[in-house]
Regions:
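A short, Lys/Arg-rich alpha-helix, primarily the initiator
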Residues: 1-24
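Alpha-helical hinge/cap motifs
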Residues: 23, 46-47, 63
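The DNA-recognition helices of helix-turn-helix-type DNA-binding domains
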Residues: 36, 47, 73-76
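Alpha-helical residues within the helix-turn-helix
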Residues: 20, 31, 60
Length: 99
């Protein structure tokens, strides 16, 4: 079985696909979004999650969709949880089988 890649935090995408290439500081993006600078810094540093509010603001400022940011966060959360409880999940037997 192939090893799964570690989860990618949405802050990595924000940092590597937007902040760095656009030479945009966290403070400048925060100002456009109308949020505290620390919120963008903590996301970009992979220290906090992207909320629905932040996703909506990022989508407007960066011309993306809110769903992009929420999907990235959801994928990160699910993968992180899988890593945390993977052995417990392996013990669960399905009670419904696929048709």
């Amino acid at each position: 079985m192939a090893k799964k890649l570690p989860p990618m935090h949405p802050g990595e995408v924000l940092r590597e696909e937007f902040l760095v290439p656009l030479s945009l500081s966290a403070g400048a993006l925060a100002k456009v979004c109308g949020v505290p600078r620390t919120r963008i810094e903590r996301i970009a540093n992979e220290e906090t999650a992207i909320t629905t509010d932040t996703a909506l603001r990022l989508s407007k400022a960066l011309n993306t969709s809110a769903q992009l940011w929420l999907n990235l966060q959801n994928a990160y959360d699910v993968r992180t949880a899988e890593l945390g409880i993977g052995r417990e999940l392996d013990k669960i037997k399905p009670i419904v089988t696929a048709a």
